[in-house]
């Protein structure tokens, strides 16, 4: 009896060992396979199919069986004709940009625009579905410059704002040949903000010294812990005004008909008022644009998919959320 129990125990250990070994091998294989598959790529989606599938489902749900047979027969003939005309159709490339403080989406935007420029001709168009409340000037300046590549190549750019294109977001939008805004989308905020807390008095109360040494009078203007002077404050304000002038001149260059002095006081407006001020060209939504162009254009959504490792994704998410929170509390200079 003891021998049988010992044998069963030994057998259980062997089976457990085999299961653990196989699990470890599977885990290693999965990790190696994932590493091979971790690569960035351009994803292309034919948006026509989505709209047509929804439309057809609704139509079929209202038909009788006899009507369905007739409809399917007509649809086959229609599909054959569309297949012949497909290559001659103009293309509408659809991009999405949901901006954060640093305009990190510009990494994908530059790749998407480069891909479009390789295949697009002057009859094609680009629709950018934009959503951004602005951020750092160098990030949004680069994003606007990427969009300007389309303009320089003579490819018509339409920007659709369903929710918000303010400050740096509007810097991007103004590059477009045509701006469409939802009635209550937030538009404008053409201004620059800079603010920073100063803990110098608190440090003195706690008997803590803070030393700051620079080579160059304006290597640092306002600091969080140093003693800020009137001259450094003036320099800080001068930098903000210089940035604002550059911002205004860029918008004026892109939209010459705009009364820049009237709209560049940092104020924002809803879409309907923005139309009156010529900040946008039409009231509508991105869905209106896509449906109106569905018959004439082939709708292609272009997405840059950046594959990250699990650890990289986690650390990037934590860092991004932390920096977003801190920047919302402590705004600093050159902030659109």
Curated annotation (Swiss-Prot):
The active site is at residues 167, 219. GO terms for molecular function: serine-type endopeptidase activity. It is found in: Cell membrane. Keywords: Cell membrane, Hydrolase, Membrane, Protease, Serine protease, Transmembrane, Transmembrane helix. GO terms for cellular component: plasma membrane. The chain crosses the membrane at residues 10-32. Pfam families: Peptidase_S49, Peptidase_S49_N. Gene3D superfamilies: 2-enoyl-CoA Hydratase, Chain A, domain 1, 6.20.330.10. Possible protease. Belongs to the peptidase S49 family. This is Probable protease SohB. It comes from Buchnera aphidicola subsp. Acyrthosiphon pisum (strain APS).
């Amino acid at each position: 009896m003891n021998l049988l129990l010992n044998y069963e125990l030994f057998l259980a250990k062997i089976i457990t060992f085999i299961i653990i070994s196989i699990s470890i091998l599977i885990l290693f294989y999965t990790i190696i396979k994932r590493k091979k598959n971790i690569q960035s790529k351009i994803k292309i989606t034919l948006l026509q199919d989505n709209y047509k599938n929804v439309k057809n489902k609704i139509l079929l749900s209202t038909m009788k069986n006899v009507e369905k047979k007739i409809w399917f027969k007509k649809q086959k003939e229609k599909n054959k004709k569309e297949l012949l005309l497909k290559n001659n159709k103009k293309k509408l490339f659809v991009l999405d940009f949901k901006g954060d403080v640093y305009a990190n989406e510009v990494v994908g935007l530059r790749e998407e625009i480069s891909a479009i420029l390789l295949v697009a001709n002057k009859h094609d168009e680009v629709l950018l579905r934009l959503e951004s409340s602005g951020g750092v000037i160098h990030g949004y300046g680069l994003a606007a410059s990427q969009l300007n590549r389309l303009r320089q190549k003579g490819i018509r750019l339409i920007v659709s704002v369903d929710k918000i294109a303010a400050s740096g977001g509007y810097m991007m939008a103004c590059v477009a040949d045509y701006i469409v805004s939802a009635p209550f989308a937030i538009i404008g905020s053409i201004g620059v903000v800079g603010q920073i807390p100063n803990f110098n008095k608190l440090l003195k109360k706690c008997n803590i010294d803070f030393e700051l040494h620079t080579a160059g009078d304006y290597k640092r203007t306002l600091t969080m812990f140093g003693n800020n002077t009137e001259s450094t404050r003036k320099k800080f304000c001068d930098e903000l005004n210089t940035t604002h002038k550059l911002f205004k001149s860029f918008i004026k260059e892109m939209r010459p008909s705009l009364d820049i002095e009237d709209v560049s006081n940092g104020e924002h407006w809803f879409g309907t008022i923005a139309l009156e001020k010529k900040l946008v060209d039409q009231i509508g939504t991105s869905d209106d644009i896509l449906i109106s162009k569905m018959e004439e254009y082939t709708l292609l959504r272009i997405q840059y998919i950046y594959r990250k490792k699990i650890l990289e994704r986690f650390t990037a998410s934590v860092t991004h959320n932390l920096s977003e929170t801190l920047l919302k509390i402590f705004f600093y200079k050159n902030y659109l």
